[in-house]
Amino acid sequence: MSHEEDLIDYSDEELQTTDAAATTAAPAANGDAAKKGDLTVSGGRPDKKGSYVGIHSTGFRDFLLKGELLRAITDCGFEHPSEVQQVCIPTAILNVDVLCQAKSGLGKTAVFVLTTLHQLEPVPGECSVLVMCHTRELAYQIKNEYARFSKYLPDVKTAVFYGGTPIQKDVEVLSNKESYPNIVVGTPGRLNALVRDKKLSLRNVKAFVLDECDKMLDQIDMRRDVQEIFRATPADKQVMMFSATLSQEIRPVCKKFMRNPLEVYVDDDTKLTLHGLQQYYIKLSEAEKNRKLNELLDSLEFNQVIIFVKSTLRANELDKLLRECNFPSIAVHSGVSQEERIKRYKEFKEFNKRICVATDVFGRGIDIERINLAINYDLPADADSYLHRVGRAGRFGTKGLSISFVSNEEDEKVLKDIEKRFEVALPEYPEGGVDSSTYMA
């Protein structure tokens, strides 16, 4: 399977459970922080404590990453770095320690994956990058991210080690110089066992990464494992830590592992994601949806539109109806064969089609810069899914418009949950429509 396939090879059900709750973080501990949009940024310069030097990047090329990484990024469909990536990557690739708080969906995994791959000069039989996290599922996911971004770096070997599987299999991987990983991802308990038994050597580690660091450093047993592993690595290395939440109490604990880190705290991830997005709802009956959708597509200016429905069957039916009404559309959902789904994804991304009907397969992880209109034909089941859906039309602060159809009591409940979660009062769509300058770049 290609990595492009991997990008959109999700079932609809898998995408219903994602945590996008808002967080509020206090200013950086050293008191000398710079505010950048919804971020608090401080430190990161070895010669001048408390200063911040950054660049505003419109594309990943501005980071001067390896050409092989840029090719992989393009293949994955990512066109612009998120604000967290803009702040962290330029400093991180200079070997500066990083402490970053950012919720899932803001691209923090890509920060350390791209940084470590850019810096890595793989030596056969040597582990140079060590990444730890608190669950097997997250470890496996991170390993897949390394595979995705290292597709044009054939000499880079990555392995994942975690409990619940026979340790002998891990030992076999580490006993063979051909399979010995340059990048190791795993959970603290299993990694500590491999280090203690002298199966895994960390004497050449140049980057030490903790994802969801507060989860590991809060628990005494896990913290002990992390500390023992840390002591097995060289003193001169880069340390990067990331988490969804970083309390005032845990930050000093994290910084004990670091030297004057760049500190990045997202004040409110929901504001960051939805900034620049005009959001409205329309109350109507189920029977009125098709007529209203036709009216909107006729009257609104847009570059590309994505229309979300709740099932593959409804996606096919709506796609057929739109084409019958002379709106050339495509449907993307888990019921479409993998080969056909890739073909349709490319058609949409390359602007050969302007209208896409989708389930939550397209609800997250797809960054297509021309989408500036998102319509919830069927409102999602929860506020988290809403955030990921409408974020397609307001990626990383660009302008966009979202319109949600509210047709029953359950929809009204979800609408109230959305307003409560994101601390906004969504207005009803005005009868006279909206000014295109408010959502067209």
From Swiss-Prot:
One of its GO terms (cellular component) is transcription export complex. A motif (DECD box) lies at residues 211-214. It comes from the Eukaryota. Residues 292-437 form the Helicase C-terminal domain. A motif (Q motif) lies at residues 58-86. Residues 23-42 are annotated as: Disordered. Residues 23-32 have a biased composition (Low complexity). It is an enzyme of class 3 (hydrolase). Pfam families: DEAD (PF00270), Helicase_C (PF00271). ATP binds at residues 102-109. Keywords: ATP-binding, Helicase, Hydrolase, mRNA processing, mRNA splicing, mRNA transport, Nucleotide-binding, Nucleus, RNA-binding, Spliceosome, Transport. It catalyses: ATP + H2O = ADP + phosphate + H(+). Its main location: nucleus. InterPro entries: DEAD/DEAH_box_helicase_dom, Helicase_ATP-bd, Helicase_C-like, P-loop_NTPase, RNA_helicase_DEAD_Q_motif. GO terms for molecular function: ATP binding; ATP hydrolysis activity; RNA binding; RNA helicase activity. Residues 89-264 form the Helicase ATP-binding domain. PANTHER family: ATP-DEPENDENT RNA HELICASE DBP3. Belongs to the DEAD box helicase family. DECD subfamily. ATP-binding RNA helicase involved in transcription elongation and required for the export of mRNA out of the nucleus. SUB2 also plays a role in pre-mRNA splicing and spliceosome assembly. May be involved in rDNA and telomeric silencing, and maintenance of genome integrity. The Q motif is unique to and characteristic of the DEAD box family of RNA helicases and controls ATP binding and hydrolysis. This is ATP-dependent RNA helicase sub2. It comes from Aspergillus oryzae (strain ATCC 42149 / RIB 40) (Yellow koji mold). The lineage of its organism: Eukaryota, Fungi, Dikarya, Ascomycota, Pezizomycotina. The gene is sub2.
